[in-house]
């Protein structure tokens, strides 16, 4: 018996063997795309040479300038044992030179690079792909995003990069990293976008692209480009436990870099808007507890006094679901849209309060430079908790009990609330959110005990901190080398 299904259309037989294009032709087509992108982008990629004079060679942490192009990033430690000759610490030369990368974004001589490439340099020289050299006459930096713009002397009609749209990138997209790793000028490597939205310790105001395109010391500041030859990121750091490339690199999305660089070029600094709230991810349990099961949003845990949010009437336990019509579902997404909003203007913030939507008009203000950071001794953190700040070590701590920290249940200690960006703690790798359990062999469970434990300690003598992170226990030595 035969069964007929549907209409009596002619039968089409499908081959069991999949039909494919000529694999060599397909590979050649991809190779041609790489060649085209590299050819379009390389002319605008530059070598950034920074030099620090002898009297400034040693930084506060005792690290010689220039030997590590990743200095100041979360990954500088990975290169201390793996640097090539000429980059080794204590090199003994009367002055030190560093080499990084950059990309020309304005034909009149504006180069975009990383802050850590030019930070602290007495002299910066830019070398173009055609061999021409220019002196930097002005450098503007934004350490919070690790970006800098360099203005060149007597430059005109320079080759400029085409800037793409990093928001359009999709995981799996092909990209090229271009730069000067280990002083090998105009090196091109290929890879894909491995992930988006990565966050890295000390660089608080950037959300990184992750790529497996090879990035090494000297690549910092160079472009990550798509197959159209458009810059989609600024290569910044790698993750490695050996000092060598291990397939994980990070780049600042060009949309973010463009926003920062435009402000640096226009005014010399970056103004970011702020609300003045402590926020957290809204969990499913908390959403249900607040009467909004399944709701996505950002939970307001505290409203700081005398801030835009406080003036507007934002309340603790409000759930922010949109800002100026843009939905927000994570603390970082809210921070991004707020910091780029127009300062001095009113913005509609939609919150859920007692299960009902409420629209609050907030006049966003510029984020104060040291918001919440006390100068020394006891202070008050945003939200009202008492803190203790030690300037010699550059740490501000608060009691663990003052902040919900599920990762530290069962552990006593004090929470690192803030770290001076250029302080000894930052140089030692300490970051906000870490739990300090002991100073030396002395357990600390309150800011009083922490203050007593470091009494009389000096940066020159150093302190050993036993800490707890969400990944486990660690020990950090904070000591100023002299």
Regions found by a protein language model. Give the residues of each.
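A conserved glycine-rich beta-strand in the N-terminal activation segment of trypsin-fold
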Residues: 26-36, 88-110, 132-135, 159-162, ...
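C-terminal subregion of chymotrypsin/trypsin-like serine protease catalytic domains
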Residues: 231-267, 272
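Flexible, gly/ser-rich surface segments that form the specificity/activation loops bordering the active-site cleft
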Residues: 117, 161-165, 173-204, 241, ...
């Amino acid at each position: 018996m035969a069964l007929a299904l549907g209409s009596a259309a002619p039968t089409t037989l499908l081959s069991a063997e999949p039909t494919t294009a000529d694999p060599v032709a397909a590979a050649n087509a991809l190779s041609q795309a790489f060649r085209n992108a590299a050819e379009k982008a390389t002319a605008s990629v530059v070598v950034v040479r920074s030099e620090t004079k002898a009297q400034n060679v040693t930084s506060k942490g005792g690290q010689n300038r220039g030997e590590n192009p990743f200095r100041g990033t979360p990954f500088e430690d990975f290169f201390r044992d793996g640097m090539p000759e000429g980059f080794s610490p204590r090199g003994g030369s009367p002055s030190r030179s560093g080499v990084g990368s950059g990309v020309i974004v304005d034909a009149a001589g504006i180069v975009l690079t990383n802050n850590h490439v030019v930070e602290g340099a007495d002299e910066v020289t830019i070398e173009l792909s055609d061999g021409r050299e220019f002196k930097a006459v002005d450098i503007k930096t934004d350490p919070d995003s690790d970006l800098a713009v360099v203005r060149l002397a007597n430059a005109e009609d320079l080759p400029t990069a085409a800037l793409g749209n990093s928001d359009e990138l999709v995981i799996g997209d092909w990209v090229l990293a271009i730069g000067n790793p280990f002083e090998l000028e105009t090196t091109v490597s290929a890879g894909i976008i491995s992930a988006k939205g990565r966050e890295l310790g000390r660089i608080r105001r950037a959300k990184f692209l992750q790529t497996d395109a090879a990035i090494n010391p000297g690549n910092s500041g160079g472009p990550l480009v798509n197959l159209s030859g458009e810059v989609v990121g600024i290569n910044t750091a790698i993750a490695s436990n050996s000092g060598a490339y291990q397939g994980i690199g990070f780049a600042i999305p060009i949309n973010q870099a463009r926003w920062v660089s435009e402000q640096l070029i226009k005014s010399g600094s970056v103004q970011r808007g702020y609300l003045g709230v402590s926020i957290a991810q809204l969990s499913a349990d908390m959403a249900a507890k607040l009467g909004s099961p399944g709701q996505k949003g950002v939970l307001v845990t505290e409203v700081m006094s005398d801030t835009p949010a406080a003036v507007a009437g934002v309340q603790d336990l409000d759930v922010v679901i949109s800002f100026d019509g843009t939905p927000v579902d994570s603390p970082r997404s809210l921070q991004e849209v707020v910091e780029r909003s127009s300062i001095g203007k009113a913005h509609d913030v939609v919150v859920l309060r007692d299960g009902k939507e409420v629209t609050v008009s907030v006049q966003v203000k510029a984020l104060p430079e040291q918001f919440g950071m006390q100068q020394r001794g006891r202070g008050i953190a945003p939200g009202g908790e008492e803190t203790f700040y030690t300037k010699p070590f550059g740490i501000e701590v608060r009691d663990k009990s003052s902040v919900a920290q599920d990762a530290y249940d069962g552990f006593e200690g004090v929470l690192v609330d803030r770290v001076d960006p250029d302080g000894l703690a930052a140089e030692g790798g300490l970051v906000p959110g870490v739990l300090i359990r002991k100073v030396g062999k002395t357990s600390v469970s309150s800011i009083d005990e922490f203050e007593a434990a470091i009494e009389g300690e000096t940066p020159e003598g150093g302190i050993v901190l036993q800490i707890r992170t969400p990944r486990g226990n660690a020990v950090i030595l904070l000591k100023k080398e002299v």
